[in-house]
Amino acid sequence: MSFASTLYKTVFKRNSVFVGTVFASAFVFQAAFDTGVTSWYENHNKGKLWKDIKGGIMNGGEEDEEDDE
C-alpha cells in the first residue's frame, strides 16, 4: 500500500476527519509559531522590554540623576 493511499484512507476519505485534522494542525502550528516568534522577539529586544526595566523604574529609577536647584 502506498503512502498516498494510506493518507487518503486515514485523513481525506471522511470530511469530518479531514476538518478535524485541519483544525488540530492549525492549533499546533499556532502554538509553535507563537512560541517561536515570542522567543525571537524577546531575545531581539533584550534590555528594552518592560520586564527588563521594571525593577529599575519601580525602585526609584537611576541614581545618576541630579536635581536642578
Swiss-Prot record:
Compartment(s) where it occurs, according to its Swiss-Prot or TrEMBL record: Mitochondrion inner membrane
GO BP: mitochondrial electron transport, ubiquinol to cytochrome c
Transmembrane segments: 19-44
Keywords linked to the UniProt accession: Electron transport, Membrane, Mitochondrion, Mitochondrion inner membrane, Respiratory chain, Transmembrane, Transmembrane helix, Transport
Glycosyltransferase found in the keyword field: no
Gene3D superfamilies: Cytochrome b-c1 complex subunit 9
Membrane disposition: Single-pass membrane protein
Stretches in topological domain Mitochondrial intermembrane: 45-69
SUPFAM superfamilies, alphabetized: Subunit X (non-heme 7 kDa protein) of cytochrome bc1 complex (Ubiquinol-cytochrome c reductase) (SSF81514)
Lineage: superkingdom: Eukaryota
Quaternary structure and partners: Component of the ubiquinol-cytochrome c oxidoreductase (cytochrome b-c1 complex, complex III, CIII), a multisubunit enzyme composed of 3 respiratory subunits cytochrome b, cytochrome c1 and Rieske protein, 2 core protein subunits, and additional low-molecular weight protein subunits. The complex exists as an obligatory dimer and forms supercomplexes (SCs) in the inner mitochondrial membrane with cytochrome c oxidase (complex IV, CIV).
Protein task: Component of the ubiquinol-cytochrome c oxidoreductase, a multisubunit transmembrane complex that is part of the mitochondrial electron transport chain which drives oxidative phosphorylation.
Name of protein: Cytochrome b-c1 complex subunit 9
Annotated organism of origin: Kluyveromyces lactis (strain ATCC 8585 / CBS 2359 / DSM 70799 / NBRC 1267 / NRRL Y-1140 / WM37)
